[in-house]
Swiss-Prot record:
Name of the protein this chain belongs to: ATP synthase subunit delta
Subunit note: F-type ATPases have 2 components, F(1) - the catalytic core - and F(0) - the membrane proton channel. F(1) has five subunits: alpha(3), beta(3), gamma(1), delta(1), epsilon(1). F(0) has three main subunits: a(1), b(2) and c(10-14). The alpha and beta chains form an alternating ring which encloses part of the gamma chain. F(1) is attached to F(0) by a central stalk formed by the gamma and epsilon chains, while a peripheral stalk is formed by the delta and b chains.
Gene: atpH
Any matching Pfam family: OSCP
Molecular functions (GO terms): proton-transporting ATP synthase activity, rotational mechanism
Length: 272
């Protein structure tokens, strides 16, 4: 996202947070605003002329705002209308940045609602585990990544996988990401995990362990990693019995291989 667009997004995040903090129903308003912003983006994705008109610098701000109100007024909640109107009054580098910005705002609204319910950490972990499930099911990922299938078809497929297993926030975030793919499904979901963690100022540590980690083990590992990296760390783990023992930890692009399998590979390499 270009500089002008980043500045616009920062202002809109403040507008969104202010509105959510002032409402008596933060959960309901956050959920409605988030899902409605996703719907707005879907409309903009399908209409190039509209998205160009809404950021056209040749049109004055009032004209762009009135256009947005004529399209969405009475069809979305007051909170969503306020965000969309504020968005089109900003300067965006291109239409893609506008749409990506609205997606981020939709996600933020949903996550603020989840946080108000004490569910943000759960959402983060559910997204991580969902990514791992899809990663282990190549046929499922292939179907979810099929650009020949409509966004609705991909969402319907994932909805069947998710039904009754995750929070409504996790479901809404995952379905939106799968319906609007920019990269592989697993990568989309992993990006979401990073985004959720970043709201709490945390960096994600992805751990593959030979045996399931208990909460105390995760907490101890998190403390150690925080001392190494000098920032808050969110530990998410999965079981990989092929490691034989120990664990492999990935933080960003850095990998710490403390697994038995890794030690054996290094030993063989040194002997060879």
């Amino acid at each position: 996202m270009h500089a002008a667009s980043r500045e616009a997004l920062e202002r809109l995040e403040q507008t969104l947070d202010q509105g959510l903090n002032e409402t008596s129903d933060k959960v309901g308003t956050g959920v409605n605003t988030g899902t409605e912003l996703f719907d707005v983006v879907e409309l903009l994705d399908s209409d190039r002329g509209l998205r160009v008109a809404l950021i056209d610098p040749a049109r004055d701000t009032n004209t762009r705002v009135e256009l947005a109100k004529s399209l969405f007024g009475g069809k979305v909640s007051a909170s969503t209308e306020e965000i969309v109107s504020a968005a089109v009054s900003q300067s965006w580098s291109n239409t893609r940045d506008l749409r990506d910005g609205l997606v981020k705002l939709g996600r933020l609204a949903l996550l603020r609602a989840a946080d108000a319910q004490g569910q943000q950490d759960r959402v983060e972990d559910e997204l991580f585990q969902l990514a791992r499930i899809i990663e282990r099911e190549p046929e499922l990922e292939l179907k979810l990544a099929d650009r020949a299938a409509s966004p609705d078809a991909r969402r319907d497929l994932l909805a069947k996988v998710l039904y009754g297993k995750v929070t409504s926030t996790t479901e809404a975030l995952a379905l939106q990401a799968i319906g609007r793919l920019r990269q592989r499904p697993v990568e989309e979901l992993d990006s979401l995990v990073d985004e959720v963690a970043a709201l709490e100022g945390r960096t994600v540590a992805r751990v593959r362990a030979a045996a399931a980690l208990g909460e105390q083990q995760k907490s101890t590992l998190s403390d150690k990693l925080e001392k190494i990296y000098g920032r808050k760390i969110a530990v998410h783990s999965e079981v990989d019995t092929s490691l034989l023992g120990g664990a492999v930890i990935r933080v960003g692009h850095e990998v710490i291989d403390g697994s038995t399998a890794g030690n054996l590979r290094r030993l063989r390499a040194s002997i060879a």
